[in-house]
Amino acid sequence: MKWIVIVAGLLSFHRNAQEQSLCYEISHEKLGIERSYLFGTMHAMEENSFFFPKRITKLLEKSDALCLEIKNITEVRIEPEMLYDTTLHLKAYCDSTEWSNLTIWAEEKLFMKPIQFEENFEHAKPFMLFQFILAMNLPANKKSHEQELEKIAASNKIQLLGLESVHEQLNIFNQIPFDDQMDMVFSELNNDEKNIKDFNEMQQAYRKQELNVICEYATNEKLDGNISLFLDDRNKKWIPKMKEMMKEECVFFAVGAGHLCGENGLISLLKKEGFNLKVIKL
């Protein structure tokens, strides 16, 4: 169920970036932190457009630990109650046209008849459906920075760490009213061509390491006023954890590129904590 966290990366693009790099060396003289790294990822990219410079491999191999947003995501068990609510009836949040559009989508993309779709999704929390639609708009042949980094870490016996749990990440959606979640569902469903186009343009910006372009992308429409939940609040929770990890060892942090951006992005927050960040050209 790896698709559960795709949204955390693809929706992690925010405004007001002032840096033009995806990778940074972190240090803090007073805390005795000589070296760690921060790398902004794109959780899913088309395989033939995948951007993974050799320098990233070298930097990780020089590190003691790899820290992702969530460690071992493919091995995490997700409890059904995190995805379903038996008191919820998804159909009640749709008018007849919207429900018809959903069943048409399910038949085309999931090969489910309307009755099958209703049986499987009637009690699903809307964000689960949203992430299915989002995942279906991604390329069939895709690669993930996180998977590649995990492979390198495993082959070099590098410790694997995480900044949050799957349950913490999924709980973000539980703080969003179902009506707002359904708005996200239909925004993704009704704009699939535009979203695919935006994804392709985002890939190109990522390959060029244009963090400012990535951070200006109109994904704010998808976040729909919930930027604090998806980005800012999480960044602020991560900073103390990152600081403690870096006191112990050299850590290679890899998080969605959007987490680097803006006044409440990791770059800015780390600087406010007295860290020095040195741009690394890839």
Where is each model-derived feature located?
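Short, well-ordered alpha-helical scaffold segments within catalytic/effector domains
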Residues: 4, 53, 235-239
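Structured, acidic catalytic/metal-binding patches in enzyme active sites
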Residues: 26-37, 42-223, 229-230
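Bacterial Sec-dependent N-terminal signal peptides
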Residues: 1-25
